[in-house]
């Protein structure tokens, strides 16, 4: 029988909504048929460290927190890892799960995708009601300032599904080449201080 053990690496309760995010990701992965062995960095005891090597795949949620650990575990134990953008929004969640499914095929992937599609249908109806009342959600400029992985995940969701943004600026270190296509501008720390003045 196929094994479907995974670890989530790079989670923390100190990030906004971190504990709830960890619970939601565990729920999504469990629904797809994965056994989440550890959530490294969030509610994990020292005794659980040995269990990290028992997974077939490590999923790095916030690369600035977990990428070094995932590389170390791969080197020491041979456990492969992936580090997709965190799943913000429905499209982001679908993309995130798709990358995991490609790396380690799930037992029940269709159930997880069906749940996202049902949530999208509910969201569509709710959003249309809001649009009828308030009009389209449009912004001339939006600035996202957050830890690197969260900033780029939020930027992707804002750009692709949450709102119509003419100019999107992200104040975070560049994550990868794909980030160039998400934001119109990347600001440095000095730029964000000037923008606050």
Show which residues each predicted segment covers.
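An N-terminal assembly and electron-transfer interface module characteristic of large anaerobic redox
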Residues: 1-197
């Amino acid at each position: 029988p196929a094994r479907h053990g995974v670890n989530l690496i790079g989670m923390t309760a100190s990030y906004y909504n971190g504990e709830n995010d960890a619970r939601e990701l565990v729920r999504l992965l469990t629904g797809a048929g994965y056994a989440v062995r550890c959530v490294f960095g969030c509610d994990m005891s020292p005794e659980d460290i040995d269990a990290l090597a028992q997974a077939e795949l490590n999923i790095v949620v916030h690369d600035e927190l977990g990428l070094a650990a995932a590389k170390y575990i791969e080197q020491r134990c041979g456990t492969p890892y992936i580090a997709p953008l965190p799943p913000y929004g429905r499209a982001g969640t679908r993309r995130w799960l798709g990358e995991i499914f490609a790396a380690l095929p799930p037992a029940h992937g269709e159930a997880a995708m069906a749940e996202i599609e049902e949530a999208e249908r509910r969201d569509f109806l709710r959003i249309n009601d809001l649009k009828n009342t308030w009009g389209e959600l449009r912004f001339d400029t939006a600035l996202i300032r957050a830890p690197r992985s969260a900033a780029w995940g939020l930027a992707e969701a804002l750009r692709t599904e949450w709102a119509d943004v003419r100019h999107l600026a992200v104040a975070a270190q560049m994550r990868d080449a794909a980030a160039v296509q998400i934001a119109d501008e990347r600001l440095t720390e000095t730029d964000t201080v000037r923008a606050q003045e």
